[in-house]
Amino acid sequence: MQQKKTFAILLSLAMIVTIVLGNGTFVSAATTEAITGISYYVDSVNGNDDNDGTSEAKAWKSLEKVNATTFKPGDELRFKRGCSWSGLLSPKGSGEKGNPITIDAYGDVKDGRPVINGDSWCGDKGDDLENRVFNTAVYFYNQEYWEITSIEVTNHTKTKDDHIKKYGILIMGQDAGTLHEINVKNTYVHDVISIPIGQQAGIGRGGIVYAIRGNKKATNWEDITVEGNYVKNVNHYGINFISTWGSSTFPDESGITEGGGGTYRSKNLVIRSNYCENVGNAAICPSDYENALIEYNVANGCNSGPNGNVPIWWEHGQKTICQYNEVFGSGASGDKE
């Protein structure tokens, strides 16, 4: 009798701990709970930062509330369509393999994308050789396992800050080792306008930028996808990867002076199905990597600045596949198509 009771208890525990999927795969309940995460909603019109943010009816309001929150694996951060925010979006935390944190939109698709306008926000951890500041609308620092999608990003104001080098989305790693899977998909990044390109070619700045800085601990990216983005009216680079842990970092143009003293390439980059239009320099330029797939991208009217160069090019890379891309309408300066 005691043996039957013990078996029944063990069987019950097994049923609680294990879920059997239709295909016969066994997944622990703990794993299922982690994947679920929490969905947070942000509404700049009807939200309130005193809310818990976990439903559309109890949405947060401000970027300040978002930036003060450390998100966990499986969480979703959802911005309401038709709303806009001015300032910096810089959420904290990291996801995990197979369980990223997601930025997405909610609401009626006819209302357009939620808009993040950098609007002259400046940080003090910059790489600018002259001013030691940077200006960006979206910023991640030493984080990994994020999916950034469905938002609109802009960063242009007609003020004295136009001479600060600007970014749309800046993803930075510094003295952190290998950082994985911060993916940017289906975003609209436009009007990232700053210092005139004639003064500096702006390598390492632009619409969507992955930047490795520092010289103390070798740092790189691994398994990064940039896909389906529309990048328009950017007077530096459209999509750019650059690192201090490479052989050539163009210090006169990028402002990078703290070279790592060795080579530590990023691995497995996918740059696919992006449309870059009216970009002052290159539409796409990865550097310091091993294994890159660059395919099905369009560069329309790029290389339009006085110091522009080839609309799609790469530097200090190994095992590059560049295929099925389209380039047209390039400017007359610098290198050509």
Per-region residue spans from a language model:
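Acidic Gly/Asp/Thr-rich repetitive segments characteristic of extracellular carbohydrate-active
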Residues: 42-80, 84-85, 89
